[in-house]
Amino acid sequence: MIRRICLDHFRRVENKCIELSRFSLLYGPPNAGKTTFMEGAALLIQSRGEQWLAFEGPLLIIHEPEDVHFGGDLERPFAVELSVEVEGELITYGYRYATASNYVEQWVGKDGKLLARMAKRGERGALLYPVEADLCVAPYAVMNEDALITCGAVEDERLRVAERALLTLRVGLKDKFYLLSGRRLAAWKYTYETHVDLMPATSVGPEGQFTAHHLSRILTQAAYERTRELLYAYLPLAGVEDVRVGLVKSGRIAMYVKSGGLWTNAYNAGNYTKAVLPVLLQLLLANPGSAVFVDDADLAVPATHAERLLGAFLEIARARGLQLVLAAKEPAFATAAERLGLEVVSL
């Protein structure tokens, strides 16, 4: 479970941390930083185990470094820090980077105590804590023990503990984080063609782009019988009576929904259905114990539907042992969240 996210000069957040519980709502006006916190966490998590920050990955795509540097200043480093509860331990991991100089700095801690800090020094790297030592390479590797390889032997148990903490965090976050962005309406403008071997096993994609593909599996495969039952139980919440998936002439998968007794292509469905259905499906598919982050949870949702919708999301999350973190700007969502027992984080 993700307990804390800290950002320093990342996108529009100058320096701020937020504390999260199992069920949280990030609430604030437009441009308050709700998306920034979610995407900061996503950037680190999609980069886990990589040799560099993965600006383009399965959770989000960042085309230019200027997009994440505060004020577009490539000289000033940005930093993202996560505190994650894994196997009964609270592991903190931070990554600082400046595009102009390629400066990098990392740190890892456990249960509130710093275990190791390393940074780029010259063309190589240096271990700054718990002792000073030269690193064989600059510590660019993300959430990876490779960033702690020293050129000589270092006899300090804290370094071994730091290596184990990085391994625990990297493995513990595998297939345990899902992000649904506010761009999920765009995916419904066209059908997707993808090889099933390349499709995420349990993710509908950050833009809901694999919604139809997963529905095809759920509706046709016996292994998804329980998921199918739950889907139909919650389907009216998305404003539709039934759903079908089929192939169009190009060989691509297309989705059809039934509403008011009539069938139509999902492209013709209202924005409410387009916004809500991928979220419901993601909650039903997510691996137990995962964190599901939903940006713009109030997207195309009338204020009168807020409590009913949040209540259903919460019900599924509780039943499946998920962490649920939502973001919304509508006051009705904050009011409903408080009534339902979600922690409201005001930005």
Give the location of each predicted region.
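Switch/communication elements of ASCE P-loop NTPase nucleotide-binding domains
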Residues: 1-71, 85, 242-347
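Phosphate-coordinating catalytic segments in nucleotide- and nucleic-acid-processing enzymes
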Residues: 48-276, 287
